[in-house]
Amino acid sequence: MDEENDMREWSLDDEILLFDLMCDFKPAGHDKDKQMSIIVEKMNENVSEGTKPFSADDIWKKLGGMYDLERVDELEDYIDEDEDSAEEDGAPNEKEEDKKEDIDQSSKDPDSSGLSDVETDMASEREELEVPKSGSRGNNKNKKDRVRKVDTKEDSTAVETKDAEVTNENEDANDDGDDNNEEEDEGNDENEQEDPDDDDQDDDDDENESGEGSLQKRVTRGARKHQHELSDQTGTPKPKKRTRSSAKLDAVETPPPSKRSQKTATPPAQQTPTASAKRRKKSEVQESDADKSNTRRSKRSLVPATTPSKPQAPPIRRSSRKK
């Protein structure tokens, strides 16, 4: 009961003032009694008349109910001991040692005063440039990333150049293929012009063999051998040898209708020019060249006789295929 009566009643203003003083004067460590006496004096300055003044016991009780004072003292004593040991040993700072070394060197070499200043500047710059290991690793990672980016860019450019070379080679091959196709088409056109004579010879051969002018079916190699065997057995005369090549005999089994009959039976229909018209055949080109030559002859006949007549140049054969 006596302790409860001895407990001081703290107002809000008193607690705020105590916390402010705690920040300025910490009652812990070796100087906790000295700091507490200052806090008591500051607290009693604002006490009104008729109120009980603050004592050290009142403040310690208040702080003991809020903090673990023993733990605070242990931590504060440990910090104070480190500071005291450093002061007792009198260990100079690293900067002071560097300054002393620079002074000693300058005293030994009077002419090297400028060099000592340069060395101190270099030492300070080195200290500034020193970076922890984590930072150096980060810089190394950034460098590696940059190197990788440069490598990827070089690889991409190399791949692009290779693709361009491949496309150029393909284009050249396609151009060569187009030229070869054009030559084959021209050769086929010439063969088409020569085919009517071959067809006429085939028709004549067929008429001679039949004796009646009727068209017989072309015979394959197997059938021809079979006919030879039958003729050997029966004694009938063998058929005449065909003049056509074996490749054409193998490729075509049935003869196409002769072009003579096609020309006589059905006249060629007039072709209307369209946007997607096929290229003209060489026969049509020759007809157009013949028409042009006739017009030239008619014009030459109109020229007066005084002008000397020049020999007619043969018509130039031009291919209508676009190259």
Curated annotation (Swiss-Prot):
Biased composition (Acidic residues): 74-91, 166-210
InterPro entries in the cross-refs: Eaf7/MRGBP
One Pfam match: Eaf7
Entry's Gene Ontology cellular component terms: NuA4 histone acetyltransferase complex; nucleus
Low complexity composition-biased segments: 263-276
Compartments in which it is found: Nucleus
Location of the region described as Disordered in the Swiss-Prot/TrEMBL record: 74-323
Main subcellular localisation: nucleus
GO BP annotations listed: chromatin organization; DNA repair; regulation of transcription by RNA polymerase II
Chain intervals with Basic and acidic residues compositional bias: 92-111, 148-165, 283-294
Key words, A-Z: Chromatin regulator, DNA damage, DNA repair, Nucleus, Transcription, Transcription regulation
Ranges of Basic residues composition bias in the record: 218-227
Assembly, per entry: Component of the NuA4 histone acetyltransferase complex.
Entry's family note: Belongs to the EAF7 family.
PANTHER family: MRG-BINDING PROTEIN (PTHR13581), MRG_MORF4L-BINDING PROTEIN (PTHR13581:SF5)
Protein's job: Component of the NuA4 histone acetyltransferase complex which is involved in transcriptional activation of selected genes principally by acetylation of nucleosomal histone H4 and H2A. The NuA4 complex is also involved in DNA repair.
Protein name per its UniProtKB record: Chromatin modification-related protein EAF7
Species for this entry: Debaryomyces hansenii (strain ATCC 36239 / CBS 767 / BCRC 21394 / JCM 1990 / NBRC 0083 / IGC 2968) (Yeast)
